Amino acid sequence: MEFYRRCFEQNLKYAVIFEDNVIVKDHQLYDQIQSVIDVMGDNFEMCFFHCLSRYPDRRENGLERVKWISSTKCYLIHVENMKQYYKYFFPIDNHVDMKHEDIIAEGARVYYKDMRKYMRIDRGKGSTIGHSDWGKKGYFSRQYPNVKTDVLIRGY
């Protein structure tokens, strides 16, 4: 969450977050990210370029709008737009990469664009945050507690 605070203080318009296990395979990744900015302008809060799984909503401007998404390996934020949603990350009562469902529920426009062609994830080491199935194998979301995992689209 420190990252958001620094972006706000620096008055950035956009920021891209890469986790430390993202490996850029093709520098066209940056052109693809710029194309999202060019198309979406100020009309989004976040766009993910990696996910383990997602619950799609609809297509908009060549991107997939999502109701829910997991994993935060690489994504773009519209810094000014995210200011109104920052408070919904708190309290941190779930993994940060799972808190995005809370800002989506509050109206954040969150998208996905598959960028596996341009990057890969080094999975040589295990996750440091751990994950849970909440004791229910079909459960994936607090916002959609009665929706089963078969609606999810798997990422990479």
Spans of features found by a protein language model:
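An acidic/histidine-cluster motif and surrounding catalytic segment
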Residues: 1-18, 22-156
